[in-house]
């Protein structure tokens, strides 16, 4: 076992604070509308330029082991805030740095660290309650655009794109961000249910100019099995041909003579057919087939529930207004499913989301809800160079997380104003003893830090502006972008309540642990043994 280096008391805390400051100082230059960029060196390829706090934090490793421990703990604050709300990482880091710095000063002055922590926790609990009271629901498109704009570092086009996407696919819809091909940002919206499976044979194509299959008001056969024998399908094919409508077959697979016969029927124009594989694998495939059945008012033909393909009738088939299939995707538009049944299915999946333990499962379930309830929007980010593309894509993703958080828990005045108002409201809060009161003061002072940092980054005098904002009330604050005072909500400077709340809670949680640290243990660096020198008589 390697030998350890141990530091106690003030020695340990000073080292830890130095690490905290290195990381926080690198992150906090990005805060606010006039925040600067940070350039990150990569082991290969061009450097990355970012204004995203958590991306900067993740890159930082310090040589000194004790300092690095301090830096890593603050990195945890940024990561946790990012996981919870997808944004607010820089705010969380600034809050943590302030609480740790002020807290360690109090510890050095002889206060009891545990009571300080209790005081800080007490203040944060009260502050979160006040934040909830200040929160305003964020429902209209304009407010959503404003939140997106602020989070994308005052880029209005991004805010508008996100608001437009949310309007089209609903609050539940899936919105994804991809790298575009041109210079302009674009928004693609897919109405209806889309899944990643294309036609099984190019002979089904009936729109050669677009290379796709289009079926108008088709019947939809859903089978949870492989179809290789055409005899199983004859009754359904005959019934569909009589009805004079096209048929879409979604099955585990269609192969051999069954596929060949379908192709021949299509080419001769006897019955218009297209076949695709069912989306997903295993149990997820069964669930997705059931989703499509709900959407199109059909039944999944599955031997598990005693249904056989030979006995299927037109009543078992789903229907939709239109189906478009290309080589990679299938889109079912306007299924005839009953709205109440679809909502019931959505509620059932939501319940599974609540119970899901892994992020992957949760994401897949949310996609299913979106496909049933809203639709899918893709924001394609345009830029002139690869470096700009990466930076912009990260900003758009941040803005998307922020707008989601805003829709979830509402918004408060931005620019650090909400925390100043909250601190004003709980200024009279008292702890059980004097040391707890100092802890409360440490937390209250930290709540000014985000506003001060935004102002510093804008090149103004922090104390003057902080006092002016404190003297105002409600959503009165300082707009660092236009350098004027006014009503932040009216000026469209909004922060999602969830982002501000998460930043404060995670910052206080980690900072409280660091203030109560009394000892730090790390491995001693291994001393490299010197090379063996040349022995006597070995001269060339």
Swiss-Prot record:
Primary localisation category: cytoplasm
Coiled-coil residue spans: none
Source organism of this protein record: Serratia marcescens
Gene3D superfamilies assigned to the protein according to its UniProt record, in alphabetical order: GroEL (3.50.7.10), GroEL-like equatorial domain (1.10.560.10), TCP-1-like chaperonin intermediate domain (3.30.260.10)
InterPro entries on file: Chaperonin_Cpn60_CS (IPR018370), Cpn60/GroEL (IPR001844), Cpn60/GroEL/TCP-1 (IPR002423), GroEL-like_apical_dom_sf (IPR027409), GROEL-like_equatorial_sf (IPR027413), TCP-1-like_intermed_sf (IPR027410)
EC code(s) of this entry: 5.6.1.7
Keywords linked to the UniProt accession: ATP-binding, Chaperone, Cytoplasm, Isomerase, Nucleotide-binding
PANTHER family: 60 KDA HEAT SHOCK PROTEIN, MITOCHONDRIAL
Catalytic reactions on record: ATP + H2O + a folded polypeptide = ADP + phosphate + an unfolded polypeptide
Known role: Together with its co-chaperonin GroES, plays an essential role in assisting protein folding. The GroEL-GroES system forms a nano-cage that allows encapsulation of the non-native substrate proteins and provides a physical environment optimized to promote and accelerate protein folding.
NADP among keywords: no
Pfam families tied to this protein: Cpn60_TCP1
The protein's name: Chaperonin GroEL
Subunit structure: Forms a cylinder of 14 subunits composed of two heptameric rings stacked back-to-back. Interacts with the co-chaperonin GroES.
GO annotation, biological process: protein refolding
GO CC terms, sorted: cytoplasm
